[in-house]
Amino acid sequence: EDHPVHNRGEYSVCDSVNVWV
């Protein structure tokens, strides 16, 4: 999953849940 937030190493609650789940 290529997301700017993940690329920056900063995980948001919504982003992390959407990606992992």
Curated annotation (Swiss-Prot):
The keyword Secreted applies. GO terms for molecular function: growth factor activity; lipid binding; peptidase inhibitor activity; toxin activity. Glycosylated. Keywords: Disulfide bond, Glycoprotein, Growth factor, Lipid-binding, Metalloenzyme inhibitor, Metalloprotease inhibitor, Protease inhibitor, Secreted, Toxin. One of its GO terms (cellular component) is extracellular region. It is found in: Secreted. Expressed by the venom gland. The keyword Ribonucleoprotein does not apply. Nerve growth factor is important for the development and maintenance of the sympathetic and sensory nervous systems. It stimulates division and differentiation of sympathetic and embryonic sensory neurons as well as basal forebrain cholinergic neurons in the brain. Its relevance in the snake venom is not clear. However, it has been shown to inhibit metalloproteinase-dependent proteolysis of platelet glycoprotein Ib alpha, suggesting a metalloproteinase inhibition to prevent metalloprotease autodigestion and/or protection against prey proteases. Homodimer; non-covalently linked. Belongs to the NGF-beta family. This is Venom nerve growth factor Bco12.
